């Protein structure tokens, strides 16, 4: 069987995004995710600094010892995302944040990867192994932030976590242990900051395995 030939698409009102996909089924989802992510991140004066190329693929991604549905590769400035139909068919990710994985959560997952791109556009001397915690904090906060208000309320209520507090250490270890709690704590912490810019700068200039909350 010959591989599908990818076509190229653009988001009508988001020139920073270009999409390569076998067909146009995922274009609306990607454009919606980009719009929501850029809107959320703009509140924190974070904007894309260069084009983001999104490639819709039909297989899982093997990344640093585990399988993923999406990733942003800063070296090539390309974002890879598994298509929603293929993802649902494989049953690889039946739930997201304790809820059945569906179109809304797919948009959130795409927004998560777009946030990695925007983070790397704005960060100083990005080295993934050293600033994963900072990137994931922002990516999960955005992923939760772009969901519908009702979905977000249900997730926060079900998890029962409060925001990160002064003295806490934000780490990918905690994220791996409790991704929903990590997302809830990150979203609540970020959105409740009276002046978020100093903390945003901590994230963008972060060079360690965990982030200490001031």
Please give the residue ranges for each predicted region.
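Gram-negative bacterial Sec-dependent N-terminal signal peptides
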Residues: 1-4
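Acidic/histidine-rich, surface-exposed loop or edge segments in extracytoplasmic proteins
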Residues: 7-25, 84-95
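Auxiliary, metal-adjacent structural segments of Zn-dependent hydrolase domains
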Residues: 26-87, 103
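Short pre-active-site segment immediately N-terminal to the catalytic Zn-binding motif
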Residues: 87-110, 130
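Active-site recognition of the HExxH zinc-binding catalytic motif
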Residues: 108-121
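Short helix/strand-bridging catalytic loops that position acidic/His residues to coordinate divalent metals
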Residues: 122-131
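Post-HExxH zinc-binding segment in Zn-dependent metallohydrolases
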Residues: 130-162
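Long, well-structured alpha-helical subdomains associated
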Residues: 149-214
């Amino acid at each position: 069987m010959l591989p599908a030939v990818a076509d190229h698409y653009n988001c009508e009102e988001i020139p920073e995004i270009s999409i390569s996909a076998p067909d146009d089924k995922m274009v609306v989802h990607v454009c919606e995710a980009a719009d929501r992510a850029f809107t959320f991140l703009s509140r924190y004066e974070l904007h894309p600094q260069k084009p983001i190329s999104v490639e819709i693929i039909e297989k899982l991604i093997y990344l640093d010892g585990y399988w993923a549905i999406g990733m942003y590769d800063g070296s090539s400035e390309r974002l890879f995302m598994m298509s929603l139909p293929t993802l649902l068919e494989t049953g690889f990710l039946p739930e997201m944040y304790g809820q059945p994985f569906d179109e809304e959560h797919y948009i959130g997952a795409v927004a998560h990867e777009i946030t990695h791109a925007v983070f790397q556009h704005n960060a100083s001397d990005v080295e993934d192994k050293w600033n994963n915690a900072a990137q994931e904090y922002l990516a999960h906060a955005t992923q939760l932030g772009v969901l519908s208000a009702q979905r977000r309320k249900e997730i926060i209520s079900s998890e029962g976590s409060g925001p990160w507090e002064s003295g806490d250490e934000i780490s990918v270890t905690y994220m791996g242990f409790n991704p929903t709690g990590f997302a809830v704590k990150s979203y609540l912490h970020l959105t409740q900051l009276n002046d978020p810019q100093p903390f945003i700068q901590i994230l963008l200039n972060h060079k360690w395995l965990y982030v200490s909350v001031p």
